[in-house]
Amino acid sequence: MTDQPKHILVASCLIRNMQNQILLVKHHIRGWELPQGRVEEGESLIFALSREVLEETGVTISHAKLAVVWSKVSAPAAMIFCFNARYASGELTPSEETPYVEWCSEAEAGRRVSHPTNRDRIIALLESDDTLQFRSYATSPYRLLN
């Protein structure tokens, strides 16, 4: 018998405020990106998403809608569930993991986010409509598979 595949589950979110700005966090390794984090055992995707957003940014979200599911096929394999959401409440509060948290325009987000995986996630979310999308990618080197 072979080992069962093990995938890391990640929830990520493009959050917009009333001025239509996007919330970005700056991770100490990956640079600027959307708030995201691992889904812990026993958590629903929405609970994990809300928890990660609050931990990394100090804000709460509303109207979270699943828009894009990404499959990372390279080890460690991961499924990344990407949502669009609205800012609900709270003050921007950096964390140890994300020392910078800022609202910015779509254009500024495009300039700040340099990691190709994170850039493609933002583009997919910005281009999303009411249909759920599926994308897959590999790393080393980074390449989209569909």
Question: Where would I find each of the regions flagged by the language model?
Answer:
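Conserved N-terminal beta-strand and adjoining loop/helix that marks the start
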Residues: 1-22, 69
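Residue-level preference for alpha-helix termini and adjacent loops
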Residues: 8, 31-33, 38, 91, ...
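Short active-site-proximal "capping" loops at secondary-structure junctions
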Residues: 30-31, 69-73
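Unchanged
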Residues: 39-62, 72-121
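Conserved S-adenosyl-L-methionine
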Residues: 64-68
